[in-house]
Amino acid sequence: MSPKRRTQAERAMETQGKLIAAALGVLREKGYAGFRIADVPGAAGVSRGAQSHHFPTKLELLLATFEWLYEQITERSRARLAKLKPEDDVIQQMLDDAAEFFLDDDFSISLDLIVAADRDPALREGIQRTVERNRFVVEDMWLGVLVSRGLSRDDAEDILWLIFNSVRGLAVRSLWQKDKERFERVRNSTLEIARERYAKFKR
């Protein structure tokens, strides 16, 4: 029996996936400032025409790449939340989830694009939509867990802000300073403070 032929939609998805993966590679190597859309087709192993068909502009390719990054992280957060048990340490899980996102090697790519978006309204609008569909959704899911465990919405938001903003700050600091021992101390201090606040707020 001959293998089943792929549909046009399947072939299109495969090509788009190759282009996004190649765009990520270029961003990792050269950053936003050095990103050239002309470098992507060759790295992806597709023609320039195929790239132009799926992502006619640099903006469209960058936004698709940014969205793919955030969707992968969102799915990992959903999986973590789905496995969460009543007896689990929710504060530890939140910290681990934040670290998986903000301390991932590719966070610097998203940060680079976010900074660039400050000078590009179209890029900023697209990034904002992706953040709202992904990071805000993840935060709302964690807030729902905290509220279900007896915290008010305001208290839950305080804890989420404490954890996520602390880890985000460590991620930004790591761009110019590597101090693993201090990072661990600050991370453990964040965990300790958040646990204390959780115990205090829990009804």
Swiss-Prot record:
Alphabetized, the UniProt keywords read:
DNA-binding, Repressor, Transcription, Transcription regulation
PROSITE patterns attached to this UniProt entry = HTH_TETR_2
| Cross-referenced Gene3D superfamilies | Tetracycline Repressor, domain 2
Tell me the Pfam families matching this sequence.
Answer: TetR_N
Alphabetically, the GO molecular function entries are: DNA binding
The family database entries (InterPro entries) matched by this protein are listed as: Homeodomain-like_sf, HTH_TetR, Tet_transcr_reg_TetR-rel_C_sf
In its keyword annotation, does this UniProt entry include Repeat? no
Report the DNA-binding ranges: 36-55
- The HTH tetR-type domain is annotated at 13-73
Query: What induces this one?
Result: Induced by p-cumate.
User: Does the entry annotate any disulfide bonds, and if so which pairs?
Assistant: none
Keyword check for Iron: no
Q: What does this protein do?
A: Involved in the repression of the cym and cmt operons which are responsible of the p-cymene degradation.
Indicate what this protein is called per its UniProt record.
HTH-type transcriptional regulator CymR
Name its species. Pseudomonas putida (Arthrobacter siderocapsulatus)
The gene is cymR
